[in-house]
């Protein structure tokens, strides 16, 4: 689950991080009032969406009057912002953050943290190349990224934070200020189950003080059950409607841009299914893992999700029967197809527990369901059907 910038800043401020001042506005009048309250020579109006690349997409504007703040806010709120991180429809802008005047600054730094799967620990990344996408820095000048891995038994040590400060070229009081900031960030990361933390840029102001000009936080969705206050911050308007509906039925769904809908049990098998569809010249329309408890109701909902995407021209069902029997899955598929009147080609591959019985149920159903002998055969059949 992602947080908006204003939510991220509020959370980080509660852990003692120095954040750029800002006021949330839901309309032009509120934006104008926010500009007056901040009282600087200028302000920055930022569209609040769950996507990066806002600046290049016109979602971040510098304004030098209350009238301009109102005008920019009204031009953004109620629209969809399309960035390189969104699909063609973009993300809805429901509010803007009017931020205080902080520039010019001495320099811009970068500080971020993720859970490193290779070390299975929280790893901080810092760079002198702030204000630039960290992926670009990693690709072009990786030597400018400094990494610190935190031992979960002892937590982030002051010496580690100071070492990063030295690497960033900070001096005197800035070193302790940065150490406090980084320690607060680690505490926030652990206590709130962050999956991602990023401050870019971390500005060094003309007076030498540090300030978080932007804030990006991603929460591990698996931990939301123990984070009730964080869960309240969820903005469902920023999520894909089908993905949101899928979560209500415990279906793991990710919308893609192809023509072949996929229904699979198991994330690994689902990825392999998408790979072989691509290999055979097709394009998957989604990732959909129905999980181990694939009941009739879940299969029906899975079909509905897939077919709500009007670009879907065919469906490939790939089920490996383990605990869940293939005959039970076949019965659920037949019932689902009858209930929702599926009118696109459907290819079914069943393997494992009671696979032969499952195939028999499909073949005797009288429905236009095509059985496949193996994944390779299934992919070839669905690609051929869609391209016919």
UniProtKB/Swiss-Prot annotation:
GO terms for cellular component: cytosol; succinate-CoA ligase complex. Pathway: Carbohydrate metabolism; tricarboxylic acid cycle; succinate from succinyl-CoA (ligase route): step 1/1. InterPro entries: ATP-grasp, ATP-grasp_succ-CoA_synth-type, ATP_grasp_subdomain_1, Succ-CoA_synthase_bsu_CS, SUCC_ACL_C, Succ_CoA_ligase-like_bsu, Succinyl-CoA_synth-like. The keyword Metal-binding applies. It catalyses: succinate + ATP + CoA = succinyl-CoA + ADP + phosphate; GTP + succinate + CoA = succinyl-CoA + GDP + phosphate. Residues 9-245 form the ATP-grasp domain. Keywords: ATP-binding, Ligase, Magnesium, Metal-binding, Nucleotide-binding, Tricarboxylic acid cycle. Succinyl-CoA synthetase functions in the citric acid cycle (TCA), coupling the hydrolysis of succinyl-CoA to the synthesis of either ATP or GTP and thus represents the only step of substrate-level phosphorylation in the TCA. The beta subunit provides nucleotide specificity of the enzyme and binds the substrate succinate, while the binding sites for coenzyme A and phosphate are found in the alpha subunit. HAMAP family: Succ_CoA_beta (MF_00558). Heterotetramer of two alpha and two beta subunits. Belongs to the succinate/malate CoA ligase beta subunit family. This is Succinate--CoA ligase [ADP-forming] subunit beta. It comes from Neisseria gonorrhoeae (strain ATCC 700825 / FA 1090). The lineage of its organism: Bacteria, Pseudomonadati, Pseudomonadota, Betaproteobacteria, Neisseriales. The gene is sucC.
């Amino acid at each position: 689950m992602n947080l908006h910038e204003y939510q991220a800043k509020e959370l980080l401020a509660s852990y003692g991080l120095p954040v750029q001042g800002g006021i949330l506005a839901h309309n032009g009048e509120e934006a104008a009032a926010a500009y007056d309250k901040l009282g600087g020579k200028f302000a920055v109006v930022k569209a609040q969406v769950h996507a990066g690349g806002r600046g290049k997409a016109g979602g971040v504007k510098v304004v030098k009057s209350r009238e301009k703040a109102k005008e920019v806010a009204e031009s953004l709120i109620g629209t969809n912002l399309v960035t390189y991180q969104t699909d063609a429809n973009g993300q809805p802008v429901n509010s803007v953050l009017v931020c205080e005047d902080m520039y010019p600054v001495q320099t811009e730094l970068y500080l971020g943290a993720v859970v490193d799967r290779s070390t299975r620990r929280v790893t901080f990344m810092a760079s002198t190349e702030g204000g630039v996408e960290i992926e670009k820095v990693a690709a072009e000048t990786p030597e400018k990224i400094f990494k610190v891995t935190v031992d979960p038994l002892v937590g982030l040590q002051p010496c580690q934070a100071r070492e990063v400060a030295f690497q960033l070229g900070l001096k005197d009081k800035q070193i302790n200020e940065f150490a406090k900031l980084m320690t607060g960030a680690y505490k926030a990361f652990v206590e709130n189950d962050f999956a991602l933390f990023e401050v870019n840029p971390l500005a060094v102001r003309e007076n030498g003080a540090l300030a978080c000009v932007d804030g990006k936080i991603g929460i591990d969705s698996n931990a939301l059950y123990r984070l009730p206050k964080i869960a309240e911050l969820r903005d469902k308007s920023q999520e894909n409607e089908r993905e949101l509906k899928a979560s209500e039925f415990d279906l793991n769904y990710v919308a893609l841009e192809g023509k072949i809908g996929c229904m699979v049990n198991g994330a690994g098998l689902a990825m392999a299914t998408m790979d072989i569809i691509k290999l055979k010249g097709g394009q998957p329309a989604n990732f959909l893992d129905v999980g181990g408890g694939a009941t009739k109701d879940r299969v029906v909902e899975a079909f509905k999700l897939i077919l709500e995407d009007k670009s879907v021209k065919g469906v490939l069902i790939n089920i490996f029967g383990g605990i869940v029997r293939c005959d039970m899955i076949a019965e659920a598929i037949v019932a689902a197809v009858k209930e929702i009147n599926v009118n696109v080609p459907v290819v079914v591959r069943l393997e494992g527990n009671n696979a032969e019985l499952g195939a028999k149920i499909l073949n005797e159903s009288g429905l236009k369901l095509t059985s496949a002998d193996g994944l390779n055969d299934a992919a070839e059949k669905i690609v051929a059907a869609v391209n016919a």
